[in-house]
Amino acid sequence: MQGLAVSCQLPPAAAAARWRPRASSSNREAVLQCWKYELSQDHYLGGPLRIGQSQGSLHRHRSTNFLRPAAAAISVEQDEVNTYLPKGDMWSVHKFGGTCMGTPKRIQCVANIVLGDSSERKLIIVSAMSKVTDMMYNLVQKAQSRDDSYAIALAEVFEKHMTAAKDLLDGEDLARFLSQLHSDVSNLRAMLRAIYIAGHATESFSDFVVGHGELWSAQMLSYAIKKSGAPCSWMDTREVLVVTPSGCNQVDPDYLECEKRLQKWFSRQPAEIIVATGFIASTAGNIPTTLKRDGSDFSAAIVGSLVRARQVTIWTDVDGVFSADPRKVSEAVILSTLSYQEAWEMSYFGANVLHPRTIIPVMKDNIPIVIRNMFNLSAPGTMICKQPANENGDLDACVKSFATVDNLALVNVEGTGMAGVPGTASAIFSAVKDVGANVIMISQASSEHSVCFAVPEKEVAVVSAELHDRFREALAAGRLSKVEVINGCSILAAVGLRMASTPGVSAILFDALAKANINVRAIAQGCSEYNITVVLKQQDCVRALRAAHSRFFLSKTTLAVGIIGPGLIGGALLNQLKNQTAVLKENMNIDLRVIGITGSSTMLLSDTGIDLTQWKQLLQKEAEPADIGSFVHHLSDNHVFPNKVLVDCTADTSVASHYYDWLKKGIHVITPNKKANSGPLDQYLKLRTMQRASYTHYFYEATVGAGLPIISTLRGLLETGDKILRIEGIFSGTLSYIFNNFEGTRAFSDVVAEAREAGYTEPDPRDDLSGTDVARKVVVLARESGLRLELSDIPVKSLVPETLASCSSADEFMQKLPSFDEDWARQRSDAEAAGEVLRYVGALDAVNRSGQVELRRYRRDHPFAQLSGSDNIIAFTTSRYKEQPLIVRGPGAGAEVTAGGVFCDILRLASYLGAPS
């Protein structure tokens, strides 16, 4: 028998349709009496079962893995004697939810998974087909509301299962299932009609109606398994699972009674594969009921405990348990293992893992639960067990996951009269209990001056009213100063078994929240230290979750990068990042994510990282109008990544003027742009002060010498106690190229034109020939050496003839430049006659605190005369390198080498943040 029998004859549908109850209690009672049904215990157990216990207990027989009663301990009267329920590792328990059972194709996939399990015995718990439970509840609700459409809704339920069965089954199995389906639906139609007439249904009656979804899905799966030739039985768990109400809409299993009934059931149907209904059970009085929320998972855990299964596998549509809600944190990862306590804490604080009560039955027998994805069998899933493996190393593994609870209110009870007064906390929470509110978290100051607790926002009004009423006298007398309610709160919980043994976890968590500008309203931590719970504004919750998760789960050297100026240097940098990012992540655990690229007119933004293999195409197709404020806000407001850096690849003064504000926001800055370090001295000093105060990094190696280690060499000398006497060098790659190639065979103007065509000069060569760029580099080095010089303090001898400085365009300048070729030829000839060459240099005299930029002559054996191409050369004369200067030489111009210098600064930043050297 598949359904539960009603003990009295229900009125035929036609007769019931003609009859309408009067609004009288006697009529209502008459109809309610009609619903009463009684289940025979004989139906469940095949005969009365009596159990008497003296002093023994149940023991597992070691050799056979059967459950055997201790001698004279238990006597069981049943029809079959000497029939024992096998227990232990031979059993594997699987649970498939409604999504897994949603279609005939999926039910067949479930059957294939079951058949692929090599366990000796398998017990399969199934939910109703997807959305059927809601449909069944809706049937009862419609009937209670006297909505005639309940009949149409019932027909839809019937059609759904009939269609599924026809797609899945055939032959005699299909006929049997459809016959039972017709019978059950006919009974349901009569029962719903009775509800319609009375306008009311008891909870047990509703549970009986709703439970049919599980009955039908279990039968369909058992028939599908039988098609393969495997022996299979199906179990109505109302015959086995006995529960008692425990308050708060919960039930507790009666394990002893469940064990007796399961043993009796198995004596009649000892199949190797058992398909059982989830969610439904019965009371001790054999009244149908349900296991409430997440009941099917609970069913699997109870049955797994009863048979001492090897493991319980919960099949879902996700790959396992995430370290955080992946809908809120895109970087959430699948956890391979969790402890029972961690899973319980996560479930309590809202993580979609398991209901906390699901863990209790298996926890006492150390039975692991595995969460797996039916739609991705290659994913190993998450194992919940007693002793989980470490995930990511020491500190990273101490926090396993983060969970949040929204829509809460914080209630704060405060007053000097609370301190040292016994019973105050008891009175507070007694009042909360009396109104039936659920306390999520409690925090009390050690001074006993205040206590606060979080409750669901929908319950806070009655809680507040009850507290004001209960403590009216104390409030009036001033013993309590206030009962305050703060709405719009959320809880963020960090969960981890190893938090108790790992120093510094709280510091890391609160540092992450502080850097995300999150204000914490309350804190709680149990003495077990399995979790740290903080209460914060609900509007800050997602930002807090991302910030905390990134600190513990992303690499310490995960950098969110924003690139300003995707031109020659910026474009070269992006291509270098594209080619090297994967290598850095694999070899050095440096994770670079470019989440923004902006030019002067358009910008491209991403929350998690731009695909650098097609950044140019994306910048054209998906870009939005450029706005430097919005661009920086996008970077600073992204709390997925713990560290942010802005890379300015422009030569723009207005962009450089923002460095101070970016550093103040906690954003690191890297740039080859000289404008900030050679600009007004007061602004430069303000910038450096902010950089130190904000604990951010400001790197600018490529401002002098492109990719050459000029700044770092100078810093190394100064930091080790050396004293700078003089710095002299050829700082311009453009001018180095021009004078290295001006050897007398070609006119000066021709060499300049060649350099312009090769891309060595600025669009207007006067910007290079003026010497201002070299002067800026001298100022950068002077300030790095501790000299407070302005750009105006550096005399510059420009190479631009005075009469050509006013040319309206670069083309006009290039047309008129040949008129000065004779002058340049004469200077070159004079130098050559003296065995010298012309070189344009910048010089810093640290002793006299002065600098200059000019054209000089050097002997052919001088290092400055040995250059080729666009090489730079810088000579450091110091107290240690006084007789023979320290020389740094190499290519000093070009997008690739400059971008390489910027890239080195990015890696230097990663090293400062914790990357291995």
UniProtKB/Swiss-Prot annotation:
Primary place of residence? plastid
Region feature (Aspartokinase): 90-338
Paste the cofactor note.
Answer: A sodium ion is seen in the structure; a metal ion may subtly affect the relative position of the nucleotide-binding region to influence enzyme activity, and could increase the stability of the enzyme.
Q: Which Pfam families has this protein been placed in? A: AA_kinase, ACT_9, Homoserine_dh, NAD_binding_3
Indicate the residues annotated as transit peptide: 1-89
Q: In which pathway does it act?
A: Amino-acid biosynthesis; L-lysine biosynthesis via DAP pathway; (S)-tetrahydrodipicolinate from L-aspartate: step 1/4; Amino-acid biosynthesis; L-methionine biosynthesis via de novo pathway; L-homoserine from L-aspartate: step 1/3; Amino-acid biosynthesis; L-methionine biosynthesis via de novo pathway; L-homoserine from L-aspartate: step 3/3; Amino-acid biosynthesis; L-threonine biosynthesis; L-threonine from L-aspartate: step 1/5
Instruction: Answer yes or no on keyword Ligase.
Output: no
List positions binding Na(+): E701, V704, A706, L708
Its annotated compartments are: Plastid, Chloroplast
Q: Does the keyword NAD apply?
A: yes
Where, by residue number, does NADPH bind?
I569, T650, K674, G894
* Cofactor(s) the record lists: a metal cation
One example of a Gene Ontology biological process annotation: lysine biosynthetic process via diaminopimelate
What do the Gene Ontology cellular component annotations say? chloroplast
SUPFAM superfamilies xref list: ACT-like, Carbamate kinase-like, Glyceraldehyde-3-phosphate dehydrogenase-like, C-terminal domain, NAD(P)-binding Rossmann-fold domains
Q: Which reaction does it catalyse?
A: L-homoserine + NADP(+) = L-aspartate 4-semialdehyde + NADPH + H(+); L-homoserine + NAD(+) = L-aspartate 4-semialdehyde + NADH + H(+); L-aspartate + ATP = 4-phospho-L-aspartate + ADP
Quote the catalytic residue positions: K777
Record: residues binding NAD(+): I569, T650, G894
Q: Tell me the ranges covered by the ACT domain, including all copies.
A: 413-488, 494-571
The function of this protein is: Bifunctional aspartate kinase and homoserine dehydrogenase that catalyzes the first and the third steps toward the synthesis of lysine, methionine and threonine from aspartate.
Q: Which family does it belong to?
A: In the N-terminal section; belongs to the aspartokinase family.
Subunit info? Homo- or heterodimer.
Q: Which protein is depicted?
A: Bifunctional aspartokinase/homoserine dehydrogenase 2, chloroplastic
Source organism per entry reads Zea mays (Maize)
